[in-house]
Structures are given as structure tokens and as C-alpha cells.
């Protein structure tokens, strides 16, 4: 974008602006948003000061940020995102926005140069005093001395929580001389101390808990918007007590008890740990002199204001909203007199003392003394939308008028394509700038702005893809923490005390922890399991592979088995029979597929390439991969049967559309089968819009079509006139004949009935089939399904998705009203989820009284199909503002304009349901809001409480997400294998079921488990060899290390585990050293065919297998073991060698030496 700033910099108009910008009060009029951004960015580039850009709301701030990222390095661009919503302070919010706010405040506190975008309510928000924030900025360097207690205390003040193992943002832990911290910004950090001196600082991976790179120094930012020290707490106690005493007599007697509960709920008097998320509601009482963000800026900062009049309007409504919100919470006993979240001074008063530059599109009167007014003439660019003739004549006009023409396109490919297009129009163009650009020609560069603009006085026009082809702007990515779904799902298998487990031989029990027991004078660790009644089982940790966490559907509580009974054997036999039947079916399908002959497509045509380039968005890597996989399938002679898995709105439709286009280009017909009329309509509209410039005949068959239209479509399918037909189960009726069906696309197959599924099967015969589903399919099942059905997965969301802002809060009509008004004021729509059909109409009346001007509709499952569809369609077409609905909206409907979801009694829903419902909003480039309400002061059941806790962590990083993924995975497994299997999965747990299914499939396919060359080794030594609690206190970590030791087969793995132990827990004690020695002995034994090493008191018995005995070179062995002298005796028993070793001092070292010698004496067999 340098070309653009160069042209602007040289212009006289800009130079006039530049002289007064930041020097005196100035009004700049006439500039469109993108032109304004270009000027502001250039001013910033030329100055050495901080620049503050104030907008009226967060939505506007986001839009300007996207454009500014084209000119300014992301490292220097900061935003202070505060939602335009009071309720925010009362709910648990996602860490994304908070980490952006903290990044901004930290940069300001450090006096960094930057361009800072702040919406009005961010400007007015009460904050921690600047000096206190500055005192809590910590930079740690290797070699420095630190006071550990003081340091940990500071972390707590900054909002960090102490845990035994760090796994989430905002946690820290202390183990021996190792401090782990997971800050909101940057990588998790591990600090190793030598006494009080910092010995090393390393990044570490929270999933593996292993260190990565060493760093010399690190900044530790706060984990909360507010710093809360002991002094703050004592000030807060006094202030809150006074506020409580002031408020109590002034409110209605009926709510005084509620006020008392609210007062006590802050636990200021009995707790030593304070939850920052809750205490920030009391910010008005926290500090003697709170700051606003303006106090964080340098005294010479430059201030730019975007649309003053809009800001004043927002300020008015913000003040009214804030007043009414505070009155409501005081009247209902949820708040105190004096409580506030924003400074009530006028916006102008806040920025007093700074020279301000006001940008306004139109000339306007302002109650401000202005020193300068600068007027620009700026015109919008004609929207061409691909109309070649208009484009040519407009470009010709620019050339004739000697304009500098800057064309912005988003990818390198499009640069070439655009240049070819302009050369056809005889418009001179260049793509690289060698010297300064001459007027009367176009320069085509990679870049993107939200819109183009024309500045006639400068002789400059900027044209973007939006005007050229109607495409949407690609949202710039800022730094985000990437977390793969595999990692998200991994940790649900962590064992916590109280979890249900499945023991392969004993069935379902409960995990009670790891216990160290003394058996025959030696200490060992055992896993303690509780079974039915008082039965308990202690499983040695080296047999822990027989124990798995019980994972099943969310609401499924398994019953415990009895130890020693036959019940578990029967259950397992039943499941075994069922998986064998499925394996049989799968294998038949597999054989059938391998033998089938289908149509083999050729490589992509030129039309296909053009069609794909027309897609206005950038493909995500997963989409691109899925498309390649599908095309590869189509280009083989074997018919395709592929399942495409991807969350709602992750772009499965575009993948399907490209496959459909490929089929049509080779003269084949496509049938697109969907479960509901509305979905059919939506897919039909998408296809029409995507293929409008190509000769493709698309028809719809659903209840929205007249009998006459349906008849014509049937005729067209028969003659081949219709290329693509989209429809509901009507497509499955017997009287439909295709001339040449090549591709069948089925959306959400599991939602069709049994009869329809049978019919789909017959349609599938020798035709390529692509099935789409939004329910994730578990990876473990992918394995056993491989070769039976191919699978593509889309796990990355499209670029311009904002994460849905999730709030969990108590049910309160003033919160609800605010949320509804907020969405309707931005012309959006609301889903109001109320799951009680009997009183759903009363709920609608209640909302109507709250929002008299809103159009409110009701949708529930007891309505006739037709009524329901018509209501939904009217809602999609924007005829209603609010839809009060049951969970019927959980699946499939796409309403991009509905971006607020309110769920009453969220504690009654399953997490996976909430996760899917939340996917209904945030489907466009606007921020989506989800409010999960739970009844006030209601005693929640334990599960509901856990569930709400999990929902609170429901942002991408939370465990709630993992549980939802787990439950959906199980649902996906049920869909894939049939309903009755769901029950079997619940009886034995998901992992054991998957394992049994995989074994059965492999057996049927004749794939034998590779029989281990070496038999299992039993090592039994009377030694204290375990992981003491003093060394590793966290049980999950302990189990994890034991699992690794159990799976160790090489010396590299042993070295790796030793490194990990020192890295995570510091130097290990003698018991751990012995444990590692035993594992080392076991590895030697594995490699040399030893089957048993047994401690018999004074001697150690060693047995080799017959095969190992044949392979051993006796001469080499005797020579090598001479140092052992007479302590070693060799014998033969049943053709197998036995060795006894007499125990002496340092016998463990002798044993290690002996097994190493045995391994080195093995002859390498010929096959190797």
C-alpha cells in the first residue's frame, strides 16, 4: 500500500491537513471511511507520537481496524474493545477481548508508540489507576534475583489463579523451584530458580507440559482488566459496607434480603482468594482515584475523533442506559447506590487539553471552538459488479482525466487476472512500481480496503474488489492463539478423582486416585478403584493400560459393576456380538465399493477455474484440502462415497457447490438432497447466486413449488434439460427419472427416516456420493471406517468470523431488555430460546410488553410442519425481529442477520446442545452474542452447577468446549453406526467400544494384530521404585508419566522422560531414579527376548525365550560378563536359557550391566 500513501503524502491538500493535525482543533469534512483511514495512517507514519482514534462503538472500531491493518504493522495497532453493553460487567466473558484490552493498557503504561482505537464506552470506563498498573508490569530476566513470595503475591493481584498444573490462560503453579505461568498475551512461561535467582526462562507447551525454547527475558502481563491488591480490598470493604448501609433503607423491604445476599456473595470478608471476574462489578468502590484510559496516554498524544455527532448520540443513549441499568439493579437488590462502570463526564471534558482533529463526512455544527476547517471532495466509486462495459467506460474516463488509478485485489492470482482484463479494455496498467507512478494509468497491487474512493482534487481513484466483483473484504488476521481440535479433545481423557472408568476385565468402576502402598517391605503406586457396594480394586500402575476413562453421552450415568460377578462378561459379550455384525456389514460395503465401476471425470476445465476464482472469500486450508480430496475421488473409476464433516457455517456448501459444478461441466446431472424445505430453499438460492454467470439449469423440488413446476422439473430431469436439482424427500419418489445422474449430495443424512434412507441407498448405486454433516465424527472411528467410507474434515472457521461473545448470567428482565434493544438497534434479529411449549405464548406476551415495537414470532415442534416452515421463512426474510423458539432451531437453519441468542434456564441444557445452539449466531461478519441465563438464587443441582461452570469456560479455550466436542463425537458415532449402537457405546464406554470395533473390522479384513516378536516381559524387583507425592503432587501428571513409562520401548524415550521430569519437576529423588532403572532394564529385556526377571530375595532369576536362546552367542556373552564372576550362573530349562544373579552391593547396577550384555550378545537374524 506504499504507492497509495506516497501519492497522498505528495498532495497539497494532505500537507495542509498534516500541518494542523494534532496541533489545533480542526474539523475535516468530506472523506469516506477508507479515505479517512488512509489519511490517519499517513499522519501516524509521519509522527513519533501515540495516536488515539475515538469511535462511537466497537463495531465501527472493528471496521476501521480492518482498513488500518493495510497500512500499519499489526504490532503497532491497538484496540480497546469494550462491548456496548452494561451486562458485560455482570457476566463471565471470553478472554479474547480482555487480552486485547490488557495488551493496549500495557503498551500505554509503557509509553509505547502506537495507533490506539478506542470506542466511546472504552474511553469512559473506570480503570485501575495508571501508577498501580505500571507497578504491576513485570519483566523477568535470566540471572536476576526475585523475592518469590512477593512475586507470587503480585501474580495474584494481577488476576492469576494458583493451580497444581497450568492448563488454562491466567493460571500459575509452583513446584519446587519451578514456576509456570500462562499469561493472556504470549506463550506459557516456565521459570526455573536456583534459590532466589532466575536460572532459566523457557516457553512451554500446555498440552505436553514440555519446555520449548529458552528466552533471556519475558514480560508478564496481567490476567485481568483490574489490579486488586490487599490495600484495594480493604478500601473496597469499607466503601461497599457504606454503600450497603446507604442502599438498604432506600429500597423496598421485599428486596432487602436479596441485597443482603448480593452483599455477602462477594465474599470479601471470609475469603483470601478474590475472583476478579466478579469483583469488577464493584470497580466504582475499588480505588480512591480510579483512572480512565485517557490518563494512560502521553501528554503529547494526537487525538482523532470519528464522526463527532454519532459519538454524542451514542453518549446520550449510553448515559440513559447506564442510569436505567443501575436503577434496575438497585431496585431489584442486585446493586448499590454509587455503583457505576463509566465516568459520567462529557466526552469533550474527558479529552480537554488535547488539540483534537474531528473527522465528519458532512459539514456540521459542533459546540466546540475550531481553529481550522479542511474540506475534501471525495466521491464513492461506481459499483461495477462485473459489468464489463460500465467498467471499461469508467476506467476510460479516469485515463482521459489523467487520474492516478490504484486497483486493490486480494491475491497474486487476481493481480494477473485483473491486468489481463484491463489490457483487453486497452487501459495501460502496471503491477510493480519502479519509479513514481505516472498519471493516466492503473497500478494493480495486492491489498484490500472496505470500499474504494475517488478524490477528484488529488486526481486519485482507489478501486477495490468490492466495486469490481461485489466481493466481501477479507478480514485481516491479528495474532490469535491457534488450538487444534485434536488438542481440545485430548484432555477430556484426563482422569479426575470421582470419574467413572472402565477396566477391561472388571467393568465400570470409579477412580479414587493414586495410592502408594507398602507390600512386602516395598513401596509401589496403585490406582484405586471403587466398584459396587464396598468393593475396591487396586491396580498396579504398570497395568494401567487396562483402565480407561468411561466416556459416553453427557447425561449418561453408568451403573457400577460388581467385582467378580458375571454381569460384565455378559455385557461385553453382547457388545462383541454387535460390533462383529457391524464389522460384517462394513466389510461387505467395502468389497462392494472396491468392485463397483463408476464414471471417471477428467482434470478441471477452464470454466471450473474461472468459476472457482469467482468465490468472493478466501478458502480455508481445510476447505481447499477437502475439495482436492473430492476431485481426486471423482477422477477415479471407483464411485465416490465421501463424508464431509464440518461445523455449521464452516463452508461445507462451497465445497459441495464446486463438486456439483465439476459434474455438470462433464454433462452429468446432480441431485442435492436436504432434510427440510427451508434448507432446500437456502441451498437453491446459494447455487443460483454462485452459478448465475454460467449456463447451468438449476431447479428446486419442495413444498414451495406448485405441482405444475414440479412436473416440469421432473420432465427436465428425464430429458437432461435440468442439470442440478435441489430438494427434500420429494427427490426420492419413485417416479423421478434422471437422464444421467452423476453426483448425489446428501445433507445431514441421519435426519432422514428409515424408508428414505433405503431409497437413498438405491440412488447411490454406481453414482458418486458426497454426504455433508455438521456432527463431528470421532477420530477413533475414522480408523475403523477407513476404506469403507472416505472422510474429509473442515475444522477451521472462515476468516471473518468473530468468536461469539458468551455471557453467563442470572435471569433478570433488565438484562434481557438491554440485550434485545442492543441487537434490534443494529437492525439485527434475536433467537429467544424458551423450551416450555405449554407457556411459550405467555413468554411471548411478556417479551412484547418489554419491547412493544418489536415483531415477535413463535416457533415450536407442536406446530404443523407448514406453519413452522412459514414462520421460519418469514424470520429469515426479516419480517420478525425476535423468534421465541424451542430447541427446534438447533439444526441447520442459517439466519445471518440473527446475531443474538438468549437462552432461558441454560442450566437445563446439555453442553453439546448449548454448543450447537450457540453456532446459530455469529454467522456473518458481525459479532454474535449468546446469553446463557440461569434462575436467580436457585439451588442448582451438582451437574447443573458443573455444567454452568463449564459454560463459563465456553470460549475456545475452555473445557466446556471439550465436553461438548466429546458428546457430539459420541452422537456422531451413533449417527454413523446406527441408533442401537449408541446404547452399546454407553454400556462399555466409547474408548473400549471403538477398540472392540477396530479389532473386529481388522479381523474380518484378515488384518492380524502384528504378533509381537518378543513376548511380554515381567520385571518384578523388591525395590522402592515409584513417583513420590512430594515430587509430583498432581495425580493427573503422575498418571501421565506412568503411562509414558509403561509405553517405553527405546532408550531415546527414556532419555526424553528423564528430560521431561527434570524440566517439569526439577531433579528427581532416588525412588524415581530406581523406577527409571527398572524401565531401562525392561527395554534391554524387550530387545533381547528375556521373558522374566524376578527378585527372589538373595538371587535374581532371569528367563529367556526359546527363540532368544537360539539367537544368543554364548561365547560373546561369557566374555562380556566376566566382571560378574561367580555371582552369575547359567542353566537351561525346556530348551530356554535361565540365568541367576546373586545379589551383592550395587546389585541393581550389576543387573543393568547383565541385561545389556545379553542384548549385545544376540546374533542379528538373517531376516533382519
Swiss-Prot record:
Stretches assigned to the Helicase ATP-binding domain: 633-794
**EC class (word):** hydrolase
Subcellular location(s): the record lists:
Cytoplasm
Gene Ontology annotations of biological process type: regulation of DNA-templated transcription; transcription-coupled nucleotide-excision repair, DNA damage recognition
Superkingdom, according to UniProt?
Bacteria
Q: Which Pfam families match?
A: CarD_TRCF_RID, DEAD, Helicase_C, MFD_D3, TRCF, UvrB_inter
Per UniProt, ATP binds at: 646-653
Annotated Helicase C-terminal domain residues: 808-969
- Extract one GO molecular function annotation from the record: hydrolase activity
Keywords of the record? ATP-binding, Cytoplasm, DNA damage, DNA repair, DNA-binding, Helicase, Hydrolase, Nucleotide-binding
The EC number of this protein is 3.6.4.-
* Entry-linked InterPro entries: CarD-like/TRCF_RID (IPR003711), CarD-like/TRCF_RID_sf (IPR036101), DEAD/DEAH_box_helicase_dom (IPR011545), Helicase_ATP-bd (IPR014001), Helicase_C-like (IPR001650), Mfd (IPR004576), MFD_D3 (IPR048635), P-loop_NTPase (IPR027417)
Q: Name one GO cellular component term.
A: cytoplasm
Chain span(s) of sequence motif DEEQ box = 747-750
Task: Write down the PANTHER family for this protein, in alphabetical order.
Answer: ATP-DEPENDENT DNA HELICASE HOMOLOG RECG, CHLOROPLASTIC
The UniProt entry's sequence similarity note says: In the N-terminal section; belongs to the UvrB family. In the C-terminal section; belongs to the helicase family. RecG subfamily.
Task: Check the record and name the HAMAP family matching this protein.
Answer: TRCF
Summarizing the function annotation, the protein's role is: Couples transcription and DNA repair by recognizing RNA polymerase (RNAP) stalled at DNA lesions. Mediates ATP-dependent release of RNAP and its truncated transcript from the DNA, and recruitment of nucleotide excision repair machinery to the damaged site.
- Identify this protein by name: Transcription-repair-coupling factor
**Origin species:** Staphylococcus aureus (strain MSSA476)
Gene name, Swiss-Prot/TrEMBL: mfd
Amino acid at each position: 500500500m506504499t504507492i497509495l500513501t506516497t501519492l497522498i503524502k505528495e498532495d497539497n491538500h494532505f500537507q495542509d491537513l498534516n500541518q494542523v493535525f494534532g496541533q489545533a482543533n480542526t474539523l475535516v469534512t468530506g472523506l469516506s471511511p477508507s479515505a479517512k483511514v488512509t489519511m490517519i495512517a499517513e499522519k501516524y507514519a509521519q509522527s513519533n507520537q501515540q495516536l488515539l482514534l475515538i469511535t462511537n462503538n466497537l463495531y465501527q472500531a472493528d471496521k476501521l481496524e480492518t482498513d488500518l491493518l493495510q497500512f500499519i504493522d499489526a504490532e503497532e495497532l491497538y484496540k480497546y474493545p469494550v462491548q456496548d453493553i452494561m451486562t458485560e460487567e455482570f457476566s463471565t466473558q471470553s478472554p479474547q477481548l480482555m487480552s486485547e484490552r490488557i495488551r493496549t493498557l500495557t503498551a500505554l503504561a509503557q509509553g509505547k508508540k502506537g495507533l490506539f482505537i478506542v470506542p466511546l464506552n472504552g474511553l469512559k470506563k473506570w480503570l485501575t489507576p495508571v501508577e498501580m498498573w505500571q507497578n504491576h508490569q513485570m519483566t523477568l530476566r535470566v540471572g536476576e534475583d526475585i523475592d518469590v513470595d512477593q512475586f507470587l503475591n503480585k501474580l495474584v493481584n494481577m488476576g492469576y489463579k494458583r493451580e497444581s498444573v497450568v492448563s488454562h490462560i491466567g493460571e500459575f503453579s509452583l513446584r519446587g523451584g519451578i514456576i509456570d505461568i500462562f499469561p493472556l498475551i504470549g506463550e506459557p512461561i516456565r521459570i526455573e530458580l536456583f534459590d532466589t535467582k532466575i536460572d532459566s526462562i523457557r516457553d512451554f507447551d500446555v498440552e505436553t507440559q514440555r519446555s520449548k525454547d529458552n528466552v533471556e527475558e519475558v514480560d508478564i502481563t496481567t490476567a485481568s482488566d483490574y489490579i486488586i491488591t490487599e490495600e484495594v480490598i480493604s478500601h473496597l470493604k469499607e466503601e461497599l459496607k457504606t454503600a450497603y448501609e446507604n442502599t438498604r433503607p432506600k429500597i423496598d423491604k421485599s428486596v432487602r434480603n436479596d441485597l443482603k445476599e448480593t452483599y455477602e456473595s462477594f465474599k470479601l470478608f471470609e475469603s483470601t482468594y478474590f475472583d476478579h471476574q466478579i469483583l469488577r462489578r464493584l470497580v466504582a468502590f475499588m480505588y480512591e482515584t480510579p483512572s480512565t484510559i485517557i490518563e494512560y496516554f502521553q501528554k503529547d498524544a494526537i487525538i482523532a475523533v470519528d464522526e463527532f455527532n454519532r459519538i454524542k448520540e451514542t453518549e446520550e443513549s449510553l448515559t440513559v442506559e447506564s442510569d436505567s441499568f443501575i436503577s434496575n439493579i438497585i431496585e431489584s437488590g442486585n446493586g448499590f447506590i454509587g455503583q457505576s462502570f463509566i465516568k459520567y463526564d462529557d466526552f469533550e471534558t474527558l479529552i480537554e487539553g488535547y488539540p483534537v482533529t474531528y473527522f465528519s463526512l458532512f459539514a456540521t455544527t459542533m459546540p466546540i471552538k475550531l481553529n481550522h476547517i479542511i474540506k475534501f471532495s471525495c466521491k464513492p466509486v461506481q459499483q461495477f459488479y462485473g459489468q464489463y462495459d460500465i467498467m471499461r467506460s469508467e476506467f476510460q474516463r479516469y485515463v482521459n482525466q489523467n487520474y492516478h488509478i490504484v486497483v486493490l485485489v486480494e491475491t497474486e492470482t487476481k493481480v494477473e487476472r485483473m491486468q489481463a482484463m484491463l489490457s483487453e479494455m486497452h487501459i495501460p496498467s502496471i503491477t510493480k512500481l519502479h519509479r513514481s507512478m505516472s498519471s493516466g494509468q492503473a497500478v494493480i497491487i495486492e491489498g484490500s480496503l472496505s470500499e474504494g474512493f475517488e478524490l477528484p482534487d488529488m486526481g486519485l481513484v482507489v478501486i477495490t474488489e468490492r466495486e469490481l466483483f461485489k466481493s466481501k473484504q477479507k478480514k485481516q488476521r491479528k495474532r490469535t492463539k491457534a488450538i487444534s481440535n485434536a488438542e481440545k479433545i485430548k484432555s477430556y481423557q484426563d482422569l479426575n478423582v470421582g470419574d467413572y472408568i472402565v477396566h477391561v476385565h472388571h467393568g465400570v468402576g470409579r477412580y479414587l486416585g493414586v495410592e502408594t502402598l507398602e507390600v512386602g517391605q516395598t513401596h509401589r503406586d496403585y490406582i484405586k478403584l471403587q466398584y459396587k457396594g464396598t468393593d475396591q480394586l487396586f491396580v498396579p500402575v504398570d497395568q494401567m493400560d487396562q483402565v480407561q476413562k468411561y466416556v459416553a453421552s453427557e447425561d449418561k450415568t453408568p451403573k457400577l459393576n460388581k467385582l467378580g460377578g458375571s454381569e460384565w462378561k455378559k455385557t461385553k459379550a453382547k457388545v462383541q456380538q454387535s460390533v462383529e455384525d457391524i464389522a460384517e456389514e462394513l466389510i461387505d460395503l467395502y468389497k462392494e465399493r472396491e468392485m463397483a465401476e463408476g464414471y471417471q471425470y477428467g482434470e478441471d476445465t477452464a470454466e471450473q477455474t474461472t468459476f472457482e476464482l469467482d468465490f468472493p472469500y478466501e478458502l480455508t486450508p481445510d476447505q481447499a484440502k477437502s475439495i482436492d480430496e473430492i476431485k481426486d475421488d471423482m477422477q477415479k473409476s471407483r464411485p465416490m462415497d465421501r463424508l464431509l464433516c464440518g461445523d455449521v457455517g464452516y463452508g461445507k456448501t462451497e465445497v459441495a457447490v464446486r463438486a456439483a459444478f465439476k459434474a455438470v461441466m462433464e454433462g452429468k446431472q446432480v441431485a442435492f438432497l436436504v432434510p427440510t424445505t427451508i434448507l432446500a430453499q437456502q441451498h437453491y438460492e446459494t447455487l443460483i447466486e454462485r452459478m448465475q454467470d454460467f449456463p447451468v439449469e438449476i431447479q428446486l423440488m419442495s413444498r414451495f413449488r406448485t405441482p405444475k413446476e414440479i412436473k416440469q422439473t421432473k420432465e427436465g430431469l428425464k430429458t437432461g434439460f435440468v442439470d442440478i436439482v435441489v430438494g427434500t424427500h420429494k427427490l426420492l419418489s419413485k417416479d423421478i427419472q434422471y437422464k444421467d445422474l452423476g453426483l448425489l449430495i446428501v445433507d445431514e443424512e441421519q435426519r432422514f427416516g428409515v424408508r428414505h434412507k433405503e431409497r437413498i441407498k438405491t440412488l447411490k448405486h454406481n453414482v458418486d456420493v458426497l454426504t455433508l454433516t455438521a456432527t463431528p465424527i470421532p477420530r477413533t472411528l475414522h480408523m475403523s471406517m477407513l476404506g469403507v467410507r472416505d472422510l474429509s474434515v473442515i475444522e477451521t472457521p472462515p476468516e471473518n468470523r468473530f468468536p461469539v461473545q458468551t455471557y453467563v448470567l442470572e435471569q433478570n428482565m433488565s438484562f434481557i431488555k438491554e440485550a434485545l434493544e442492543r441487537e434490534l438497534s443494529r437492525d439485527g434479529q434475536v433467537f429467544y430460546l424458551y423450551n416450555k411449549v405449554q407457556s411459550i405464548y405467555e413468554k411471548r406476551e411478556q417479551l412484547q410488553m418489554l419491547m412493544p415495537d418489536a415483531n415477535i414470532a413463535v416457533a415450536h415442534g407442536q406446530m404443523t410442519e407448514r406453519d413452522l416452515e412459514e414462520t421460519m421463512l418469514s424470520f429469515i426474510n426479516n419480517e420478525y425481529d425476535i423468534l421465541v423458539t424451542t430447541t427446534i432451531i438447533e439444526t441447520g437453519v442459517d439466519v445471518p442477520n440473527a446475531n443474538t441468542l438468549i437462552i432461558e434456564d441454560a442450566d437445563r441444557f446439555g453442553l453439546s446442545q448449548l454448543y450447537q445452539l450457540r453456532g446459530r449466531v455469529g454467522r456473518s461478519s458481525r459479532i454474535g452474542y449468546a446469553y446463557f441465563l440461569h434462575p436467580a438464587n436457585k439451588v442448582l443441582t451438582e451437574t447443573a452447577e458443573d455444567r454452568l461452570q463449564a459454560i463459563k469456560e465456553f470460549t475456545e479455550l475452555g473445557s466446556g468446549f471439550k465436553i461438548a466436542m466429546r458428546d457430539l463425537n459420541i452422537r456422531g458415532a451413533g449417527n454413523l453406526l446406527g441408533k442401537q449402537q449408541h446404547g452399546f457405546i454407553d454400556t462399555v464406554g466409547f474408548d473400549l467400544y471403538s477398540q472392540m470395533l477396530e479389532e473386529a473390522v481388522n479381523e474380518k479384513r484378515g488384518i492380524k494384530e502384528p504378533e509381537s516378536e518378543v513376548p511380554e516381559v515381567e520385571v518384578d524387583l523388591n525395590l522402592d521404585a515409584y513417583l513420590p507425592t512430594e515430587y509430583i503432587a498432581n495425580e493427573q501428571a503422575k498418571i501421565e508419566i506412568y503411562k509414558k513409562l509403561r509405553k517405553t520401548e527405546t532408550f531415546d524415550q527414556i532419555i526424553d522422560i528423564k528430560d521431561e521430569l527434570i524440566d517439569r519437576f526439577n531433579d528427581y529423588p532416588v525412588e524415581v531414579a530406581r523406577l527409571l532403572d527398572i524401565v531401562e532394564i525392561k527395554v534391554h529385556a524387550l530387545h533381547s527376548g528375556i521373558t522374566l526377571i524376578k527378585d527372589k530375595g538373595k538371587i535374581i532369576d532371569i528367563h529367556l525365550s526359546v527363540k532368544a536362546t537360539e539367537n544368543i552367542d554364548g561365547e560373546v556373552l561369557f566374555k562380556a560378563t566376566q566382571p560378574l564372576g561367580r555371582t552369575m550362573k547359567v542353566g537351561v530349562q525346556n530348551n530356554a536359557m535361565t540365568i541367576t544373579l546373586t545379589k551383592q552391593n550395587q546389585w541393581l547396577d550389576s543387573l543393568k550391566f547383565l541385561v545389556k550384555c545379553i542384548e549385545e550378545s544376540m546374533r542379528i537374524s538373517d531376516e533382519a
